[in-house]
Regions:
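Catalytic beta-strand-to-alpha-helix segment of the class III nucleotidyl cyclase homology domain
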Residues: 39-42, 63-157
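Catalytic NTP-binding/metal-coordinating core of nucleotidyl cyclase/transferase enzymes
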Residues: 1-71
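Key residue(s) within conserved catalytic/signature motifs
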Residues: 1, 43, 47-48, 78-84, ...
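Intrinsically disordered or compositionally simple regulatory linkers and C-terminal tails
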Residues: 1-5, 152-177
Length: 177
């Protein structure tokens, strides 16, 4: 595991848990909540000195980049602590876009997953009350090595007992190794 250099970009990617179902069952509620959601995301990303990607993949998902990993982790925590109903964010934080996307995709709504590389650079500078919980090792992509997988914890956040959203092949590899 290598430490993230101070000048390396840290990615924060988020998606909404069950987005398609929510849009199908309550499109008016989702549309009404979307302006507040977007304003809140924009506020917390800017507060941390981050930049939102101009090309958003989904209207209720986003990508942001930060110069400092601590700012990305703080932004993720603030977003998870803020009521954003009906949006429940699945957040990934890492130093490469593909790895961040993978973390985002295996997280549950209300959960933030952080790579070991990023965690090692923020461990001494977490937001007040925040801790990191080791969840095992995870391959971050076909070309990236395995990383320690950490969950951002805080007394104001839910505790997760469910397994992560992983394809069976990935889950089997983690259980065997």
């Amino acid at each position: 595991m290598t430490e993230v250099p101070a000048n390396e970009t840290t990615w924060l990617m988020a998606r909404t848990e069950g987005s398609a179902r929510l849009w199908q069952t309550d499109s008016r509620g989702m549309a009404a909540a979307l302006p507040y959601f977007r304003a809140t995301v924009t506020h917390f990303v800017a507060l941390g000195g981050g930049t939102l990607s101009p090309s958003q993949g989904a209207c209720d998902g986003f990508t942001a980049v930060f110069d400092r990993a601590t700012d990305a982790v703080s932004c993720a925590l603030y977003l998870q602590l803020t009521p954003l109903d009906p949006f429940e964010l699945c957040i990934g934080v890492h130093s490469s876009a593909p790895g961040t996307e993978r973390l985002r995709d295996i997280a549950h709504g209300g959960q933030t997953l952080i790579s070991g590389t990023t965690a090692s650079s923020v461990a001494g500078d977490l937001p007040s009350g925040a801790t990191l919980k080791y969840l095992g090792d995870q391959r971050m992509g076909d070309t990236e090595p395995s990383e320690r997988l950490m969950q951002l914890c805080h007394p104001g956040l839910r505790r997760y007992l469910r397994p992560l959203h992983m394809p069976n092949a990935v889950l089997a590899e983690i259980l065997v190794n």
